[in-house]
Amino acid sequence: MANGVKLEPLYSIKVVCAQCEHEYLTSRVRPSFKKAYRTDTDFCAYYKTENPDFYVVRVCPECGFASTENSTLKLNERQITLFYDQVGCRWEKRDMGGPRNLEDALESYKLALLCAQVIGERDRIVASLLHHIAWLYRYQGNEEQEKRFLGYSLESYIRVFELEGVGANDARLLYLIGEIHRRLGQFQEAIQWFSRVVQDEKIMDAAMIRASREQWKLIAEQIREQKNAAIQAES
């Protein structure tokens, strides 16, 4: 609080649309409010006030093109045509730049996903959008849809790995692939990815190495619990 004025969590930034070049305002959460009180093992964070993830996607009110700050900065002619034919021609002008609730955030992410798929956006962008949608369903308590989109994000993350390979800075990608496998109950696949993080000498990310070891240990406990439950069910 400065001079008796209470600082609001949201502020506006100007964005130039990558599709139609229209300049518009979209909301962001101030850094001082980005303090998660809890974070899941796949980096899904929880906040007491505004959730910054609700505002990652910016939506052009003029044409409906939705993207993130990491998306393509300017579409080429082919991408513009693809977008208009499949998305833009049906857009009804409206402003999504203000405060967002969970449903608004979900709508913005799904629109961004559609736009990304239509224009052939990079796999890393698509994977991140899919993963964020899974988080939104987790906030909502919709486990079926959460797992559905975790599965989609897993496929995309693996495609990123296959196309780009892995370097010393990609421990987080390998860890995420392993952790999503674990969350989907695919324990053996998860172990294979966690082991890459732990055993690859090129990887120097101590936090991801430690996290991979912890989740590997958790899998062993989960498998043991499953076996004990099966034995009890038979007796």
PLM features: residue spans?
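Flexible helix-coil transition and linker loops at the boundaries of alpha-helical arrays
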Residues: 97-98, 112-126, 158-168, 202-205
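N-terminal cysteine/histidine-rich coordination modules
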Residues: 1-84
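Start-of-helix signal in alpha-solenoid helical-repeat scaffolds, especially tetratricopeptide repeats
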Residues: 103-106, 120, 124-132, 147, ...
